[in-house]
Amino acid sequence: MSILEKITSSPSECAEHLTNKDSCLSKKIQKELTSFLEKKETLGCDSESCVITHPAVKAYAQQKGLDLSKELETRFKAPGPRNNTGLLTNFNIDETLQRWAIKYTKFFNCPFSMMDFERVHYKFNQVDMVKVYKGEELQYVEGKVVKRPCNTFGCVLNTDFSTGTGKHWVAIFVDMRGDCWSIEYFNSAGNSPPGPVIRWMERVKQQLLKIHHTVKTLAVTNIRHQRSQTECGPYSLFYIRARLDNVSYAHFISARITDEDMYKFRTHLFRIA
């Protein structure tokens, strides 16, 4: 079985919380744009996202007072390097996690962080995990800031400092489901967590031990999965997605997941920009 078969994502450009994948658009927008959608080839388009980002359609929508930006943000996957091995940006990552937070209503999506988060202002270092669990921590979902109880937490970090341009993406996942809670660090290159992450994990562990009897920290780093220079972003997102779909962290320490799997996963992550 392919590793991609263990998760619930698909190559559709529609956001994954939508149950009807025949169209990603709301019924109102479908009706208003029928003439464009039926003749999308004349616009040089082969997808709905292409149609609603076409200059002629955007101009028409503006005249009619239609909010196409909201459609793109809440009903489509994030734009990104879907069919190539382009490096993922923080926007690619955060916009994907925000969309997953619509599908997984108990998932707290934390904005990306650079590795100097202990001295630079990043949400990652300010989050109180007890407040996350109790629904007292603010997060961005469906275009608005909300509070809601969450039993999972995910964030993608870059191993570079904020003064740099970025080096390598890694993942943090906190699982507050079940009897034994876990604070997990995943690095597709197989490297151990650096000091700032170790300190963060221990601090969060002490927070959670105030409300739960068993909490452990895990470094999921015993296998070097990644061999390419481009797939650290997809690997980091894949780890979070697999854990949301209840794939055990043990799967990542028992067998290598290949770069070829991540090339395919890109088609599950993004719509064509």
Curated annotation (Swiss-Prot):
It holds the Pfam family Peptidase_C48. Its EC number is 3.4.22.-. GO terms for biological process: proteolysis; symbiont-mediated suppression of host innate immune response; viral protein processing. One of its GO terms (cellular component) is virion component. GO terms for molecular function: cysteine-type endopeptidase activity. It is an enzyme of class 3 (hydrolase). This is Cysteine protease S273R. The lineage of its organism: Viruses, Varidnaviria, Bamfordvirae, Nucleocytoviricota, Pokkesviricetes.
